[in-house]
Swiss-Prot record:
Name of this chain's protein: Valine--tRNA ligase
Organism: Solibacter usitatus (strain Ellin6076)
Gene that encodes it: valS
UniProt keyword Nucleotide-binding present: yes
Domain notes: ValRS has two distinct active sites: one for aminoacylation and one for editing. The misactivated threonine is translocated from the active site to the editing site.
Enzyme class (EC, first level): ligase
Length: 855
C-alpha cells in the first residue's frame, strides 16, 4: 500500500477530528459494562480562546481518557464552558462602549440579550479549538454553566443552603472593586508587595492642653472617617487617657479613646485609629464598641459628602490633599517609607477598597470540616502530594464566602424582597405573594452569584442533578480531576465542599495538579513579555501531535514545563520518523499476504521490547508521569523500532507480516499521546473482521510475561554493541559514515558464536567487513573495547586538517563555557531536574577530556 512521501499533518488532522465526533467514537453509554472512568473538564471561560496552558491540561486529560477507553473502561470526559460573570460582562460592556453605548443605559434585560447574542457568536470558539486539538470529549454532553438544567441546580443549592442555615445575608466588610463595581471574594484579591509610606499624625487630647497621641497610618485619607482612637488597656503609657476623647484633625470631630486589643503595645506608638467603614479589623472593633460607621469613600473610589471639603475627589488625590492639609496645621509628625501588601482585583488589577455592604454569604466552616476529613482519610488524594498541605492551610483558615456580585450577567440570586413589609423570600421559583403580608409587590434581588458558585456544582450538575439520572448514578463520583494549582481554592475545594454536602460523596477520587508552561528562559508566559505561544499557530506549523508530544516530554509531576520551538521541531521530526517507518513497511509488505511467518531474531526482539515499553507506558499513565510515557515512546519508536529493528529487517528481508503486526501494536501504544498520526496510519492497515472502526477503541497493549524474550534481547544487544563500537571508531577517526571498512573482532567468550551467527547483519549495518577471532587483540592504533569485545579497524591514514582541528577545539571550549555557566547558575540548579544537572556535569567531564587530548 502506498503512503504519501511527505508527512503533512494539516492534511489529515482536521478530517479525523471531525470523523471521531461524527462516528460517536467518544460517546459514553451509562448502560455499557466495564469499570467506570469519568472526569469533567475545568470549564474554560466562554470569553476566551485556548492558550498553551489549556493545551497542556487538555493533552494530559486526553492521554488518560484515551488510555482508559482503550482499556475497555466505560469512559466519559464531559466538556463545557463557564459563563465567567465579571469577565464576560466586561467584554460586552467594552464592545457597547466602542459603539457609544453605556451598558447601564441599555438596562438589564437588553444588556442580557446582548450578552446572549455575543455568546451565540463566539461561544463555540473553545469547542472548535478543542476539537481541532484532538480532545476526546463526549460532545453530546457538552454543558454551559447557564444552561437551564445547571441553573436549576444552582437555585436548588442556594435555597437548600439557606434552609440548612448555611447561607445568610448581612452587612459586612467586603473587598470592593471600584472598576468592576462589585464585591469580590478574598480569593479574587491578588496581593502585591509595594513600596508605601507610613504617615504619623498627631491627635490632640481634649481637656488636656498640650497632650497629643500619635497615630501611624498607611491610608491618611481614611482618617476623615475615624470614629475612635484605640489604646491597649495594659499599655502603661496611656493609663491617664482611659475615658478621654481626642479631636479629629481636619474634621473637628470629637471621637472617643477606646480600650481594645486592636492596639498592640509592641507595634508603633501603641495607638491606632479606628475607621469601621474602611478596614475589616476596625469594622469588628466598631461592633464591639458600638461605634458609628462613617463611609468617606464610595463604590467608585471617590470621596463621599461625609469627607467634607474632599468630597468628589478620587481617593488617591484626596490622600495628597489630606497630607498637605495635615502638614499645614502641624499635625503631620513624620513620614517614613513602609513596605505594603497591596490588594488588587485579580481580574482588572485595580486596588480594592474595603467597604461595608449588604451581601450574601455561605458559612464555609461546617462545609470545610467535612472537606478536610475526606482528604485526611485518603478518599481524595492529591498528586503531587505536597498540594495536600496547601489545601489544608487554606481550609483550616477558611472564612465565610461572599457569594453575591453586583453584576447583571450570571445566576440571579433566587431571593425576592417584599416592598411592603421588607420580608426576604428565598425560593426555588418566583413567589406570587409575600407569605408574611400577602403583598404582591415583590422584587427579585438584583445581584448575581459568584461564578465559582455554579462551577462548584460542576461534577454533579452536569450529570443531571437534582434529578436522579442514569448519568449521575453511573459517572458520579468522577474518577479524576486534572487542573492547575491556581484554582485549587477557587474551584477544587468548593467542589469538594458542595459534593459532600449535596451528594454525600466526594466529587472525584484523585486530583492531579499540573505545572505552568514556561518559555526557554523558564519565564512565565504573558502578553506583556511577548513570549506567549498560541497553540493553534504552533499546531498549524508543527502538527497537533508534535506539540502534544513536546508538552508531554516536560510534564513531570511537580514541575513546570519548558516549551521551545526547538522541542516542537524535534517532536515533529519524531512524527516524521514514524511516518517514514510506515512508508518503508508499506512499500515492503504485501499486506494482503502479510500473514505472520516464523519470527526472526529481530522479530522476537522487537516483540520483547514492545512488551517492555507497554509495561512502562501503562505504569507512566497510571501514575500521571506523562514525561516518562513520552520518553518511553520516543526511545521505542526512534531508537529501537526505526534505528535497529528496521535496519535488521532490511538485512533479513523476510517476515514482513511480523513487522506490520509489531507496527500495529506500536501504533496502539502511541495513540493516547499522538492520536491523529496513529489513526491515519492505523486506518491504512488491513482491517480484520471484528476490528473496531477506530484505533481509539482498540485494545491498549499490556505487558505479558510470556512475550519477554531474554535470549533475543541478549543476541540483539550483542549486535548493537559491536555495531556501536564500529560507529564510534568511525566517528573518532573522522571517517565518512558510508565508507566501507575492514577490521577484526576479538572475543574469548561464548558471545563470539552469537556474533558470528549474525555476522551478515553486523557487517552490513556497520559497513565493515570483519574477521571473527577467538583470541586477544594485538596492539593497534584504532581499537575500541567493551567487556567482551575488542574491535580493531584498518583505517587509512588521513592528513589532519589544521583548520578543522582548530574549529573543533573552539567548539569544545564553547561547550565547556556553556556547561560551566549553567552549573554556576543557582536559579537554574534550584529548578532543573536532577537528571538534567547530572547530564550537564557528565558532558562537561567529557568535553574537558576531549580538549585535553587535543592539547
Amino acid at each position: 500500500m502506498q503512503i504519501e512521501k511527505v508527512y503533512e499533518p494539516q492534511r489529515f488532522e482536521p478530517h479525523w477530528a471531525q470523523w471521531w465526533i461524527d462516528s460517536n467514537i467518544f460517546r459514553a453509554n451509562p448502560e455499557s459494562p466495564g469499570r467506570v472512568f469519568s472526569l469533567v473538564i475545568p470549564p474554560p471561560n466562554v470569553t476566551g480562546v485556548l492558550h498553551i496552558g489549556h493545551m497542556l491540561e487538555h493533552t494530559e486529560i486526553d492521554v488518560s481518557t484515551r488510555w482508559h477507553r482503550m482499556l475497555g473502561d466505560n469512559t466519559l470526559w464531559l466538556p463545557g464552558t463557564d459563563h465567567a460573570g465579571i469577565a464576560t460582562q466586561m467584554v460586552v460592556a467594552r464592545q457597547l462602549k466602542e459603539e457609544g453605548i453605556n451598558y447601564r443605559d441599555l438596562g438589564r434585560e437588553k444588556f442580557e440579550e446582548r450578552v446572549w447574542q455575543w455568546k451565540a457568536q463566539s461561544g463555540d470558539t473553545i469547542k472548535r479549538q478543542m476539537v481541532r486539538l484532538g480532545a476526546s470529549c463526549d460532545w453530546s454532553r457538552e454543558r454551559f454553566t447557564l444552561d437551564p438544567g445547571l441553573s436549576r441546580a444552582v437555585r436548588e443549592v442556594f435555597v437548600s443552603l439557606y434552609e440548612r442555615g448555611l447561607l445568610y445575608r448581612g452587612e459586612y466588610m467586603t473587598n470592593w472593586c471600584p472598576s468592576c463595581n462589585t464585591a469580590i471574594s478574598d480569593l479574587e484579591v491578588a496581593h502585591a508587595d509595594v513600596a508605601g509610606h507610613l504617615w504619623h499624625i498627631r491627635y490632640p487630647v481634649n481637656g488636656m492642653p498640650g497632650r497629643f497621641v500619635t497615630v501611624a497610618t498607611t491610608r491618611p485619607e481614611t482618617m476623615l472617617g475615624d470614629t475612635a482612637i484605640a489604646v491597649n488597656a495594659k499599655d502603661p503609657r496611656y493609663q491617664d487617657l482611659h475615658g478621654k476623647t481626642v479631636q479629629l484633625p481636619l474634621m473637628d470631630r470629637e471621637i472617643p479613646i477606646i480600650l481594645d486589643d486592636l492596639a498592640d503595645p509592641q507595634f508603633g506608638t501603641g495607638v491606632v485609629k479606628v475607621t469601621p467603614a474602611h478596614d475589616p479589623n476596625d469594622f469588628e472593633a466598631g461592633k464591639r464598641h458600638n461605634l458609628a460607621k462613617i463611609q468617606v469613600i464610595d463604590n467608585n473610589a471617590r470621596m463621599t459628602a461625609a469627607a467634607g471639603p474632599y468630597a468628589g475627589l478620587d481617593r488617591f488625590d484626596a490622600r495628597k490633599r489630606v497630607v498637605s492639609a495635615l502638614e499645614e496645621i502641624g499635625a503631620l509628625v513624620k513620614v517614613e517609607d513602609y513596605p505594603l501588601s497591596l490588594g488588587k482585583c485579580d481580574r482588572c488589577k485595580t486596588p480594592v477598597e474595603p467597604l461595608i455592604s449588604t451581601q450574601w454569604f455561605v458559612k464555609t466552616k461546617p462545609l470545610a470540616e467535612k472537606a478536610i476529613a475526606v482528604v485526611e482519610s485518603g478518599e481524595i488524594g492529591f498528586v503531587p502530594q505536597n498540594w495536600t498541605k496547601t489545601y489544608y492551610e487554606w481550609m483550616y483558615n477558611i472564612r465565610d464566602w461572599c457569594v453575591s456580585r453586583q453584576l447583571w450577567w450570571g445566576h440571579r440570586i433566587p431571593a425576592w424582597h417584599c416592598g411592603e413589609c421588607k420580608e426576604i423570600i428565598v425560593a426555588r421559583e418566583a413567589p406570587k405573594a409575600c407569605p408574611r403580608c400577602a403583598s404582591e409587590n415583590l422584587t427579585q434581588d438584583t445581584d448575581v452569584l459568584d461564578t465559582w458558585f455554579s462551577s462548584g456544582l460542576w461534577p454533579f450538575s452536569t450529570l443531571g442533578w437534582p434529578d436522579q439520572t442514569a448519568d449521575l448514578a453511573k459517572y458520579y463520583p468522577t474518577t479524576l480531576l486534572i487542573t492547575g494549582f491556581d484554582i485549587l481554592f477557587f474551584w477544587v475545594a468548593r467542589m469538594v465542599m458542595f459534593g459532600l454536602e449535596f451528594m454525600g460523596e466526594v466529587p472525584f477520587k484523585q486530583v492531579y495538579i499540573h505545572g505552568l508552561v514556561r518559555d526557554a528562559d523558564r519565564q512565565k508566559m504573558s502578553k506583556t513579555k511577548g513570549n506567549v505561544i498560541d497553540p493553534l499557530v504552533v499546531t498549524e506549523k508543527y502538527g497537533t501531535d508534535a506539540v502534544r508530544m513536546a508538552l508531554l516530554q516536560g510534564a513531570a509531576p511537580g514541575t513546570d514545563i519548558v516549551l521551545t520551538e526547538e522541542r516542537m521541531e524535534s517532536s515533529r521530526a519524531f512524527a516524521n520518523k514514524i511516518w517514514n517507518a510506515a512508508r518503508f513497511l508499506f512499500m515492503n509488505a504485501d499486506q494482503s499476504a502479510a500473514a505472520p511467518a516464523e519470527p526472526t531474531i529481530e522479530d522476537r526482539w522487537i516483540v520483547s521490547r514492545l512488551n517492555a515499553a507497554a509495561e512502562t507506558a501503562n505504569r507512566a499513565i497510571e501514575q500521571y508521569r506523562y514525561h516518562e510515557l513520552a520518553q518511553e515512546l520516543w526511545k521505542f519508536f526512534w531508537h529501537e523500532f526505526c534505528d535497529w529493528y528496521l535496519e535488521l529487517k532490511k538485512v533479513s528481508a523476510t517476515g514482513w507480516g511480523n513487522a506490520v503486526a509489531a507496527f500495529e501494536t506500536a501504533l496502539r501504544l502511541l495513540h493516547p499521546a499522538m492520536p491523529f498520526l496513529t489513526e491515519e496510519l492505523w486506518q491504512r492497515l488491513e482491517r480484520k473482521e471484528g476490528d473496531p472502526k477506530s484505533i481509539a477503541l482498540a485494545q491498549y497493549p499490556q505487558y505479558r510475561a510470556e512475550l519477554a524474550d531474554s535470549e533475543a534481547e541478549k543476541e540483539v544487544a550483542i549486535i548493537q554493541e559491536i555495531v556501536t563500537l564500529a560507529r564510534t571508531l568511525r566517528t573518532e577517526s573522522k571517517l565518512d559514515p558510508k565508507q566501507q571498512l575492514k577490521g577484526a573482532l576479538y572475543c574469548r567468550t561464548a558471545s563470539l558464536a552469537i556474533a558470528q551467527r549474525h555476522a551478515d547483519a553486523i557487517q552490513k549495518i556497520a559497513r565493515t567487513t570483519l574477521e571473527f577471532k577467538a583470541e586477544a587483540p594485538p596492539k593497534a592504533d584504532v581499537i575500541r573495547s567493551t567487556v567482551e569485545f575488542d574491535l580493531v579497524l584498518d583505517v587509512p591514514k588521513v592528513e589532519e586538517d589544521p583548520a578543522r582541528k582548530q574549529k573543533e577545539r573552539e567548539q569544545l571550549e564553547k561547550n565547556i563555557a556553556n556547561s560551566k555557566r549553567q552549573l554556576g547558575d543557582e536559579v537554574f540548579l534550584s529548578k532543573a531536574p536532577a537528571k538534567v544537572v547530572d547530564s550537564i556535569r557528565a558532558k562537561l567531564v567529557d568535553y574537558e577530556a576531549q580538549l585535553a587530548k587535543m592539547l
